[in-house]
Amino acid sequence: MFPLVQAARAQPSQGPGDLALTGPTLRVRVPRSDDAAALFREASDADVTRWFSWGPYESRAQAEAYLERLPAERESGSQLDLIVERLDAGPIGISGLSEFSLRDRRATIGTWLGRAWWGTGANGESKALMCHLGFAVLGLERIGSYTSVDHVRSQRALERLGFGREGVLRRFHRHGERVLDVVVFGLLRSDWENGPLREVAVTVSGQPPPAFVVAGSALTAR
């Protein structure tokens, strides 16, 4: 499914604003203000945002407002959203880690991609990059994910990538006037080390924001 694993190569140290992880066809990196046009284009599709509590975007200003609040979220350690970009096509979506508990060494992953990139392998590669970030760089021990009980395609995708189905949280996610049940998935460090996401070749450059790094992890010891 993925190219054979290569040792992840750390590039020369840069600041947190330069964090990027690069795979065979994708890169995840810190968002910039000039990403607004691409995010508006991809997230103005109602099918793309169907399962989320926001969207679809109706103006570029909404994408700009989203990008403007991200630096404060990175500074506080509340959410680490990164641009997913094709190396040959530019930004195609967002993948992020949230619900951090550094004490428990866990976080939750969420991803959205433009419709043109569904079924292309971009979801799997972007999650491989983000899970490498979480486990190998930040020092996490668990990455979880939620998906609606009705979103069967997402559930199957998570299972293919090695996430384990752990149960259902009833009336967990408010979606407009509805409150949805969600299926909980989890990926432990040991699952990742022995699963398909670990097979993706990853190059890391820059440094993550300090608020997301587990004390004593390989990054802080480096």
Where are these regions (language model features)?
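Acyl-donor (CoA/ACP) binding surface of acyl/acetyltransferases
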Residues: M1-A46, D81-R222
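Hydrophobic residues in alpha-helical segments
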Residues: A43, F52, R74-E75
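A short hydrophobic/aromatic micro-motif that marks alpha-helical segments and, especially, helix-coil
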Residues: S59-A61, R74, W192-E193
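A generic secondary-structure signal
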Residues: R69-L70, L133
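Secondary-structure boundary/capping residues
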Residues: V48, Y57, S76-Q79, I143
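Conserved GNAT-fold acetyl-CoA-binding loop/helix
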Residues: T49-R69, L82
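Short loop/turn motifs at secondary-structure junctions and domain boundaries
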Residues: A72-G77, F163
